Amino acid sequence: MRVALLAESFLPHMNGVTGSVLQVLRHLAAEGHETLVIAPRAGEITTDLHGARTELLRSAPLPSYPEVRVVFARAARLTAILREFRPDVVHLASPFVLGWQGLAAADALRVPSVAVYQTDVVAYAEKYGMPQAAALVGRHIGRLHRRATLTLAPSTASLQQLERLGVDRLRRWGRGVDVERFGPERRSDGWRAQVARGATIVGYVGRLAPEKQVEGLAAPAGLPGTRLGFLGGGPSRPA
């Protein structure tokens, strides 16, 4: 099978969208499928892409979050790229701008599309100082996912959010834990003794950004015998 993956964000910027695309590439390669990644050009890529071809497009940084890049590619350009690759299916990773044009290209070529909803763009608009755009963004998300052949969402809550936008071709695609990276065998009693001897550690590992609402973890901070730990980077990380 030949799979074209269009990603709104990609390496070298690492986030949930990038991470899931890399996992998909790894699994598709293991099954012997051919892949093409279409994504913003944002810098040198040194990560193993598991044999995937890449088509990196000119992009511009998002003013309020420069690590995120926006591609303004015409559907005709994407249609030409896809026609040359001849995909059996188009995978749209967190589609919004590039994904909308990619969806139009897939439709033009009569290729089925699978859209993966994993970014709450409405919350982004509200958290990054554009609350007046939230309703417009929500309508766009609804149109996009209603147009896709199938939409995958990671949770019951996100499925319900899409249903409220009139999206009906839905399946849940849950997220697991990378047990090669995270497991009890990696526990370090020496490290725990240094940072929180005898205390219960409540930890957060991920991107530090307004939409993650990490401040909610302040609630257990006052509990006796509890220490908070944060590991990650992003726009909310103190300079």
What are these regions (language model features)?
Residues 112-114, 121-143, 153:
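Nucleotide-sugar donor phosphate/pyrophosphate-binding loop at the beta->alpha transition
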Residues 39, 55, 138-187, 193, ...:
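Donor nucleotide-sugar binding/catalytic pocket of nucleotide-sugar-dependent glycosyltransferases
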Residues 43, 205, 226-239:
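Glycosyltransferase donor-sugar binding loop
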Residues 1-56:
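N-terminal subdomain of nucleotide-sugar transferases
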Residues 194-225, 229:
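Conserved donor-binding/catalytic core segment of Leloir-type glycosyltransferases
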Residues 90-117, 122:
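An aromatic- and histidine-rich active-site surface loop
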Residues 52-80, 92, 132:
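A short, charged, and often flexible helix/loop element on the N-terminal side
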Residues 6-8, 154, 204-206, 231-232:
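Short hydrophobic "strand-cap" motifs at the C-terminus of beta-strands
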